[in-house]
A protein has these predicted regions:
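A residue-level signal for beta-strand positions that form part of recognition/binding surfaces
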Residues: 95-97, 131, 147, 195
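Active-site loop/helix belt of alpha/beta enzymes
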Residues: 1-118
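Short coil-to-beta-strand transition motifs
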Residues: 59, 123-131
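A general structural signal for short secondary-structure junctions and capping/turn motifs
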Residues: 39-41, 87-90, 124-126, 137-142, ...
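Glycine-rich loops and low-complexity Gly/Arg-rich segments
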Residues: 26-30, 73-83, 122-124, 160-162, ...
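C-terminal accessory subdomain/extension
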Residues: 139-263
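Short, P/G- and charge-enriched loop/turn segments at secondary-structure junctions
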Residues: 118-122, 183-185
Length: 263
């Protein structure tokens, strides 16, 4: 029994500071609600304040493996957690709970929030990707820029935006050895119901005619990291599990996880 709040606005943040301020404001905002509940419950009733979203779960990682005094963010977090966790507020014994969100999976939206003080790249942080087949390649000036048509669209990726780039997904460098050394990202630039178009990510005003060919071939499979893992993951009944630490066998399926269906 307790209060449940979801910090949806925190997805627009871009720093640990913004994630912390969102968490602080959300917790503080629950206090007046506790006061309103006081007349309905005994004073010795234990309640849980359940707050946060994926950025706040990632924020907690700033506390792992370090002395809080080494980080201003971690030090402030400790202060808020001590104040609101396992203490008495508005006459109730209160414990604090932070929503895990997609902490164990991650996605491009979460990397964009920069809620943790340090991140690795997409390849090391994001556990969910969608495999799609290349069905057409346009590298011969047929279009304004090099493009690749793939057999997945909104029904397989979702259509959730990410605030730090214009695209609907990012192609993993696992898709082609040529992408590993590329200084550009290959992104899902346009998306329709059942197909989408890949293109090089470009800066505003950049001449697209000078872009290099996309190193993919018809029939090849590409791995795409989604903007929002919740939407993308909900579209599939099962997940193929691989182990990226197994050198030479990174793409071998180790298990199949069936998804719980329904709400």
């Amino acid at each position: 029994m307790g209060l449940y709040s979801h910090s949806s606005l925190s997805y627009q943040g871009a720093s640990p500071r913004e994630a912390l301020e969102s968490l602080r404001d959300e917790i503080v905002g629950c206090v007046p609600a506790l006061g309103k509940l006081r007349k309905f419950y005994r004073s010795d009733r234990a309640l849980t304040i359940s707050v946060g979203a994926s950025p706040q779960a990632n924020l907690m990682a700033n506390l792992l493996g370090k002395d809080p005094s080494e980080s201003c963010i971690a030090l402030e977090m400790h202060g808020h957690l001590r104040k609101f966790s396992n203490s008495e507020i508005e006459g109730f014994k209160v414990s604090l709970e932070i929503h895990a969100g997609v902490y164990s999976i991650m996605d491009l939206q979460q990397l964009a929030t920069r809620a943790r003080e340090s991140y690795e790249g997409n390849e090391d942080e994001i556990a969910l990707s969608v495999i799609a087949e290349v069905v057409s390649v346009y590298n011969e000036s047929e279009r304004e820029q090099p493009e690749v048509l793939i057999a997945v669209g909104t029904l397989g990726l979702g259509r959730e935006p990410c605030h730090n780039y214009r695209g609907w997904g990012v192609v993993s460098s696992r898709s082609s050895s040529s992408l590993v050394s590329s200084k550009r990202r290959l992104v899902v630039e346009r998306i329709s119901q059942e197909h989408s178009n890949l293109a090089w990510e470009v800066a505003d005003g950049e001449d697209k005619k000078s872009l290099p060919p996309i190193p993919l071939e018809i029939g090849q499979s590409v791995f795409i990291y989604p903007n929002h893992a919740c939407f993308t993951g909900a579209m599939y009944r099962s997940y193929f599990v691989v182990d990226s630490t197994l050198k030479g066998r990174e793409n071998r399926i180790q298990a199949v996880w069936d998804r719980a269906i329904g709400w």
